[in-house]
Design a protein with these regions (language model features):
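Non-catalytic alpha-helical scaffolds and adjoining flexible linkers that form interface surfaces
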Residues: 2-30, 35-226
């Protein structure tokens, strides 16, 4: 080794992460797409195997990760240390579980890899724990989540701003905008109207983020709550 040359050493650290999705690379390797407290939206290489708990990587799981910086790539390594919350209220309820898929996909497709939004991680944790704890009717929760997500990203919806996107459903949207969470959950809507309102807010998100946000799980949610 030349005089004065230094060997680069990978740096290890722990961080909290919300699982959004994962991509299988081969039998013992996946890429986990996550929202982290320290690094924002980031993807990690994670080794799996016969003893690996794939349940760790369910959408919206909140994990403590051991992260190793990869000096040769932007794709760092990670391994799970523990799940921070059991989220049994979500995992034991097919309706909540489907809603968690939708929420994770919205964040995954809206926040680009490498992006950091101040306070977004903690905001998402609160939304996840709220869904987990809800006992009464929560079939409107994804609409409430979408409107609050807009605010978390810094573009608070105004009633007049929403009209080009919501059309005939504007009165319902305004009702949500005036309501706290318990009241919003009681707004009577058909499954079709819920789906149309959610689609209109996603179009509003697309306009403000200047991107296409194709949420595939919205149709599943519509069928489940029809």
């Amino acid at each position: 080794m030349a005089s004065g040359a230094r060997r680069q050493v990978d740096t290890a650290m722990d961080d909290s992460a919300i699982i959004l999705n994962y991509t299988k690379i081969r039998d013992n390797l996946i890429v986990v797409h996550a929202l982290t407290r320290a690094y924002g939206r980031k993807s990690f290489l994670v080794k799996t195997g016969a003893k690996a708990k794939m349940a760790y990587y369910l959408p919206l799981n909140i994990l403590e990760l051991s992260i190793t910086e990869n000096t040769k790539s932007d794709l760092w390594y990670a391994s799970p240390l523990a799940a921070k919350y059991p989220l049994l209220g979500i995992r034991n309820n097919v309706f909540k579980n489907t809603m968690s898929l939708f929420m994770a996909e919205v964040v995954y497709r809206t926040i680009k890899d490498g992006a950091q939004e101040d306070g977004l991680f903690d905001w998402c944790v609160r939304q996840i724990l709220t869904l987990d704890a809800l006992q009464a009717d929560f079939s409107n929760y994804h609409i409430y989540f979408l409107l609050e997500f807009c605010i978390a990203l810094g573009f608070r919806p105004e009633a007049t701003d929403m009209i080009p996107f919501t059309g005939e459903y504007q009165p319902f949207v305004e009702q949500f905008m005036r309501s706290d969470l318990p009241t919003a959950m009681l707004i009577p809507l058909s499954g079709r109207v819920r789906s149309e309102i959610a689609s209109s807010i996603i179009r509003y998100l697309e306009f403000h983020t200047e991107s296409t946000i194709n949420i595939r799980s919205l149709q599943v949610l519509h069928e489940l709550f029809a």
